Amino acid sequence: WLLLWAVAALAGLKPLRSAPPRSAARTQAHEIERLRSLAQAGIAVPAVLHVEPGFFVMRHCEGQRLDQLLAAADERALQWWQRGLEMLLAVHLAGQYLGQAFARNFIGQGDRLVALDFEDDPLAAMSLPQAQARDWMAYLHSSARALRALPPALRDTLPGRLRAVLA
């Protein structure tokens, strides 16, 4: 994380900073707080079922990871990608952030996505708008390889889909 921090500082790009490391107890407390805060904001996340010092239990999340769904490189994959855009926008409009908005940290369930993995705290290194910008960079970067595999006719629809979500 030190190398990424240094590169981000030299380039003046705070959203590229990694969250500084913390103790296991602080990491767990942060993840529980994020799960509860996001759920209260109406964002699909696993429910926290039980908390003890040193561990917590959350509801099992059935489904397939978004990065795996995107690997199909077809129209259905594009629909999943667009759902990810829509979810990220909903998170940000609710005044929230994810912290690790990588495609691997979303689970497709039925026709919705569930977000996972909240132990990082980017607000320890940047402002909320910067953390939200970091979410967009993580999501778009982590889905880029799968999107490159799309047939050209589908790939050409990407800018319009992104504009439609952000409009």
Give a label for each model feature.
Residues 1-26:
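ATP-binding glycine-rich loop module of kinase domains
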Residues 25-44, 67-104, 109, 113, ...:
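Conserved kinase catalytic-core helix
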Residues 50, 60, 107-108:
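Conserved hydrophobic "DFG−1" position in protein kinase catalytic cores
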Residues 51-53, 101:
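Short Gly/Ser/Thr- and Asp/Glu-enriched loop/turn motifs at secondary-structure junctions
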Residues 53, 109, 123-127:
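Histidine/lysine/aspartate-rich catalytic loop segments that bind and position anionic ligands
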Residues 53-65:
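Conserved short submotifs of the Hanks-type protein kinase catalytic core
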Residues 64-67, 123:
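Short, charged/polar, Gly/Pro-enriched secondary-structure boundary elements
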Residues 114, 118-167:
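C-lobe/activation-segment region of protein kinase-like
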